[in-house]
């Protein structure tokens, strides 16, 4: 072992090994597919409590609602959502 070495394998040696690619050839695509299904199924919206893209605006609106009264904002939004 060289002076100052931590005893770990060099990164280049790891990524050029067959064992690394056998493991990661399955793991990396599986993570990608799982993430794609998590988002495309809508489960991500339910898990994090965010509104779905089609529920941001009412049917008749073409832009984001603007709250005019600062201290009555909840009442203003409640009347808009009725």
UniProtKB/Swiss-Prot annotation:
Cofactor note: With its partner (PsbF) binds heme. PSII binds additional chlorophylls, carotenoids and specific lipids.
One GO process term, biological-process aspect: photosynthetic electron transport chain
Gene Ontology CC terms: photosystem II; plasma membrane-derived thylakoid membrane
Keyword Transmembrane attached: yes
PANTHER family associated with the record: CYTOCHROME B559 SUBUNIT BETA-RELATED
Family as reported in the entry's similarity comment: Belongs to the PsbE/PsbF family.
Name under which the protein is recorded: Cytochrome b559 subunit alpha
Native source organism of the sequence: Prochlorococcus marinus (strain NATL2A)
Gene name as annotated: psbE
């Amino acid at each position: 072992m060289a002076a100052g070495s931590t005893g770990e394998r060099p990164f280049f040696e790891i990524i050029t090994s067959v064992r690394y690619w056998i493991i990661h050839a399955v793991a990396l695509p599986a993570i990608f597919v799982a993430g794609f299904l998590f988002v495309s199924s809508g489960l991500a919206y339910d898990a994090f409590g965010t509104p779905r893209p089609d529920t941001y605006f009412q049917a008749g609106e073409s832009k984001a609602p603007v709250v005019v009264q600062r201290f009555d904002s909840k009442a203003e939004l409640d009347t808009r959502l009725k």
